[in-house]
Amino acid sequence: MFKKKLNMVSAAILIIALTSCSFNIDNLKNRFADNSDKPQEMAEPSELGSVANTVIIGMYDLDTFNPLMTKSETVKEAMEFVYEPLFELNEQVQPEPVLAKDYGMSADGKTIVINLRDDVKWHDGEGFSAYDVEYAIGQIRSGKTSYTELLKDVTSCSAENVSTVAVTFNHPVPCAAALFTFPIIKDGTDMEEKMRPVGTGAYSFSGKISTDRYMLNRFDYYYGGKPPIDGIYIDEAPDKEHYMYMCGTGAFDLSTSKTVDLRTYTPKGSVKLNYYTSNKLIYLGINNAKTELSGMNTRLAMSQLIDKEYITSSILYSRAEMTDVPINPSFWLYDGTKAQTDTLSAEGHLRIDAWTDKDTGGYARTIGGSTQTLALELIVDKGSEEKMQIADNIADKFNRYGIKTTVSPLEYNQYIQRVETKNYDIMIGEYKIPATQDISGLMGAGNIFNYNSDEMNMLINQIGMTSDTESLKGLFAQFGEKFTSDIPFVPIAYTKECMMSSPKIENIKSPGEGRFYRDSYEWRLK
């Protein structure tokens, strides 16, 4: 990661004349004459169909090719070849520059200043600039796109000059560069459905070449070098059922777990599975305001009784990685170690909180002359088979140990209402941790667990205001220690996502959160 202190420079407003998105090969030749020995000829659709050195991907639910607007996961994935982000996340959830060159953070952790590459061109030959970034972020902040939630804490974005953009947040954000993994569209891009894709990626959009096939041609003037693969075919299926059938017949060279459910689908043939640990956390939520659950030793005992290994291997089919803290196990700033090893048994922790196993069965205690029993309701979304199985497994473990637990499967809307109003004992939850690993949204003021700790709040704020790598590692380690001693809730596992690729494709880089097809310009075919 590049980090250096930057001086923000005020610049006059640049008035940009919008150009047509149509592909003008003569214009393109002129713009790139100095960068290529032999300019690329734009082929007609009939010629495109004969390209041999190609890869085939699938697509369905086409609504628009605008990568910020589409609601189709397959379209988003196809457009990864055409559009690029400022940064991408590697397998360690570490931001790596793509269109960005480097960046710096303000002392208060609220402003990121990003320097951009100066050798990037759009597929129509225009130069890439900070004004494109400003436009893309403006569209996202307007609420029009599927990325609006990602930048909900942004208060301002401005192009300081042609190669520098500054973005300010309403609170300190740790590892802020990790937020800028969305595709950048050109300044003035049509936000309507029928826009023609013009990106900066290794492959340019050539159009529809048959009834259900689109073509992406390699962009010979790509700043990363000429891609070895000539093109990408995008075969359109009428619906998901046909898409899955085509996957089953091996019609596609690439697909992902976002569109293919690996719980029910087994890839045929010699398909390579490229996994990464996502930021989606599955956990047992605990209502800390409940008298029976207010003691941290009670929560520690419950945590010890959960068989995370079984849940991960047998219920989630090893497509998850178990965890003890709400930080991605692959995260480059956290090594996952604990400062102290818990040597007490679950029974030992329960006894510290005055729980005893009565002859009648189950744990009880007497406080202020009143007898309490440790009997819990575990609510779960009945629409998720996985979560239902996890709930049943946890309830079985608790009941066997003497913690009386009843599972209550609820309709999704009813489940959400109970969680948001904090009307529950324990629950099976799911939360997508931001790529920044900023857990303030999960554990901040008013959190759904009724958990409050001044020490934890201070740690979270310090993490947000720190940019030094070694200092961040220390703070994340402190966070891990504090979390595992308090156990406001029980993290169970982070799910994994997967890119499935044909063995004929070489030089594939491990996918990362938010971008499956990383560095496709380096791919080769056997």
PLM-predicted stretches and their roles:
Residues I57-M105, G138, V198:
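N-terminal lobe/hinge region of extracytoplasmic solute-binding protein
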Residues G104, D108, T148-T189, Q304:
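Surface-exposed binding/hinge segments that line
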Residues K101-K144, E292-S294:
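Aromatic- and charge-enriched surface segment that lines or borders ligand/interaction sites
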Residues L305-D335, E386-A395, V419-K526:
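Detector for C-terminal structural segments
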Residues A177-G231, E236, E241-H242:
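Gly/Pro-rich hinge or "lid" segments in bacterial periplasmic/extracellular proteins
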Residues M59-M79, L99-A100, E126, A176-P183, ...:
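A structural "hinge/loop" feature
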Residues C157-S158, S206-M215, Y233-K290, A301, ...:
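Extracellular/periplasmic solute-recognition and catalytic clefts
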Residues S294-A395, Q478:
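Append "and occasionally in soluble cytosolic enzymes with long acidic Gly/Pro-rich linkers
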